[in-house]
């Protein structure tokens, strides 16, 4: 579904990432991890079409840069790390903006938006201005907009790009949101999400991409990647890995510095 063969990616004169060779199939939730400055957001921005690259990126067999914007809209949606919240829009209007590509009526767009407001526990806030919401509520609203954008009668082979989608959420909403994202991937779609919480990545991701030293260091299952030697090398801090008693997934504990 997504084939990446990029020799290098630069911002200005600074080379940020090199040797990006990767093929990812649908039906997957893929977490992108690595320390600050490893290029996680840059990698995601490249896939969002916001940065030029040397090489090729194919989405569903077609070069990413050759897609018409309106035809790409129902196939790829992006939630940035610091998503702007335009003043003057209600929460429902923001979510309905995801339907800009469609030919449906305003009433149909509003109906879909209403459904996604409910799924993200935002119905009581639908008529409020987006700027009045807390950071976590705004984060859920922008994610609802992305999934409203990708809401099709026959879903499949769609790409959802997320940059730290749970960073401002409480524990309840972290799991509620990740459940929705996981469900979306299981319907034949591909999710790539930058994540700093390794334990959430372990619980929800099917694969993990580890970035470091300007390139991809590892691509594998959480069980294969979340090992003490790999994590200590990646994050330069002592790490202990055990197994979750119920889900048998790696659980990561870091040690404080003395």
Curated annotation (Swiss-Prot):
InterPro entries: AAA+_ATPase (IPR003593), ABC_transporter-like_ATP-bd (IPR003439), P-loop_NTPase (IPR027417). Its main location: membrane. It is an enzyme of class 7 (translocase). Residues 1-238 form the ABC transporter domain. PROSITE patterns: ABC_TRANSPORTER_2 (PS50893), HMUV (PS51261). Keywords: ATP-binding, Cell inner membrane, Cell membrane, Membrane, Nucleotide-binding, Translocase, Transport. The keyword Membrane applies. It comes from the Bacteria. SUPFAM superfamilies: P-loop containing nucleoside triphosphate hydrolases. The keyword Lyase does not apply. Its EC number is 7.6.2.-. It is found in: Cell inner membrane. The complex is composed of two ATP-binding proteins (HmuV), two transmembrane proteins (HmuU) and a solute-binding protein (HmuT). Part of the ABC transporter complex HmuTUV involved in hemin import. Responsible for energy coupling to the transport system. This is Hemin import ATP-binding protein HmuV. It comes from Idiomarina loihiensis (strain ATCC BAA-735 / DSM 15497 / L2-TR).
């Amino acid at each position: 579904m997504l084939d990446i063969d990029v020799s290098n990616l630069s911002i200005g004169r600074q080379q940020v990432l090199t040797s990006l060779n990767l093929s990812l199939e649908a039906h997957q939730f893929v977490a992108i991890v690595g320390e600050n400055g490893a290029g996680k957001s840059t990698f995601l921005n490249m896939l969002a079409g916001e940065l030029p690259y040397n090489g090729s990126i194919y989405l569903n067999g077609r070069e990413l840069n050759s897609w018409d914007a309106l035809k790409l809209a129902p196939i790829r949606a992006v939630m940035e790390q610091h998503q702007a919240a335009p003043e003057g829009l209600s929460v429902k209007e923001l979510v309905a903006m995801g339907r800009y590509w469609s030919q449906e009526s305003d009433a149909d767009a509003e109906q879909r938006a209403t459904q996604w407001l409910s799924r993200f526990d935002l119905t009581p806030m639908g008529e409020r201005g987006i700027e009045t919401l807390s950071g976590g509520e705004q984060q859920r609203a922008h994610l609802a907009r992305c999934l409203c954008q990708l809401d099709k009668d026959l879903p499949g082979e769609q790409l959802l790009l997320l940059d730290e989608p749970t960073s401002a959420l409480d524990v309840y909403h972290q799991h509620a949101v990740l459940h929705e994202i996981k469900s979306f991937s299981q319907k034949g779609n591909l999710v790539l999400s930058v994540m700093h919480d390794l334990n959430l990545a372990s619980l929800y991701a099917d694969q993990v991409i580890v970035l470091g030293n300007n390139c991809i260091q590892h691509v594998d299952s959480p069980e294969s990647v979340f090992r003490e030697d790999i994590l200590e090398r990646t994050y330069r801090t002592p790490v202990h890995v055990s197994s979750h008693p119920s889900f048998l997934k790696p659980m990561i504990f870091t040690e404080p510095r003395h």
